[in-house]
């Protein structure tokens, strides 16, 4: 059986093209496009990298390198909601360990794991750019300041 070439769905392709057209150089849209792909699929399908590289007029290994470099991109373990937890020094000093422990208590998983129902994955990241609100975490694109396990449980219940 012949393998067909991967194609983006029209809706996604249109969004990617809008991002590409926004910038003077196509390559400048790479992060926005990767976020768009991840938001659409829940992760970055490996077969999507070649068509994206073609759209951006970049070598495939450049796009692969960007995906590998940034820990905000998931290449596997599809989860509907990625909980990115800042583990930089400021957040660490302000209580990241308490946040991670609360997530483990509520979800029953450790960082890097996906809940059995496929809804949540805990992903430690280096910086979310919100040091004044430390410790911070994001559920997909929504940013939150961690205050307590009760507050965290309330936030996560919005995503079920």
UniProtKB/Swiss-Prot annotation:
The gene is nuoE. It is an enzyme of class 7 (translocase). Signal peptide: none annotated. GO terms for biological process: respiratory electron transport chain. Its cofactor is [2Fe-2S] cluster. InterPro entries: NuoE-like, NuoE_dom, NuoE_N, Thioredoxin-like_sf. This is NADH-quinone oxidoreductase subunit E. Binds 1 [2Fe-2S] cluster. It catalyses: a quinone + NADH + 5 H(+)(in) = a quinol + NAD(+) + 4 H(+)(out). Keywords: 2Fe-2S, Iron, Iron-sulfur, Metal-binding, NAD, Quinone, Translocase. [2Fe-2S] cluster binds at residues 86, 91, 127, 131. GO terms for molecular function: 2 iron, 2 sulfur cluster binding; metal ion binding; oxidoreductase activity; quinone binding. Belongs to the complex I 24 kDa subunit family. NDH-1 shuttles electrons from NADH, via FMN and iron-sulfur (Fe-S) centers, to quinones in the respiratory chain. Couples the redox reaction to proton translocation (for every two electrons transferred, four hydrogen ions are translocated across the cytoplasmic membrane), and thus conserves the redox energy in a proton gradient.
